[in-house]
């Protein structure tokens, strides 16, 4: 019987060649991009220079490790269920808001529900006085990040004092090998009244629009998804006039964007409810290049909201509303005061 002797050098070359055959991205023809407002995912530690004392054990909320761990597990369950609602194991990319820091994000992606997917985190602490941030998590088998930056939103009150709020997070990379950009937002709230706070959201819209225009000035057909809790609806001026997010599909050359959640809003659906009126604050807005159906290229397939029964209040004055963690200082033990929203892309 012949014996074959392989040199060490040959073995190394063989291993390198074999490993190079492994695809950079998992093979799939569909991708899900989601957004979720986590409704105050805070740890239990009183952090210096951050107004987070209400989420500590000695506060009126009596926030503690048990409640925190339940909250993290709840958020992870919802994120996984967003994927399963569209026959994914878990979403490809998820934009997030209302979390305190990177530590809580590490706990989130390390839960049993999400740990298998190896989610990576894009996050920077924002200057928001409450300490709440925006972030993006992604599956590295489906998305490869090339770069990111936090773009500050500079706004001032009537006396000229700066209002410290969330930045906008721009994350650029390749989804299934195709270049794409995500802009994760949490625009200023309606605290103090919708009309009085309106200029701040218009300023946020101008910033988002300037980021989009900057990218498209170099690549007009760039794939961009603006996502976030905008604290405005699709028919508010900040969204439809300044951001130029239309309610109908746009031509590839159009200056307008496509608001993928707007059709659901005009059907009476929403991601949060206030005084029995549904709002669609949690939106995903696409550049027109994602509306072109070209073979082998990413394009928009559908949009949706995850509003399963377990995510809804089942009784009382708020029957049917999102089942939230707190109502004031009363611990409700639910999930979030927002439903998650998403889009599906395919090629």
Where are these regions (language model features)?
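Metal-dependent phosphoester-hydrolase catalytic domains
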Residues: 21-23, 214-224, 232-347
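N-terminal, active-site-proximal structural segment of metallo-dependent hydrolase catalytic domains
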Residues: 21-112, 122-134, 311-320, 346-347
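Second-shell loop/turn segments in exported
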Residues: 57-68, 90-96, 123-124, 157-159, ...
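Extracytoplasmic, non-cytosolic globular domains
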Residues: 123, 169-264
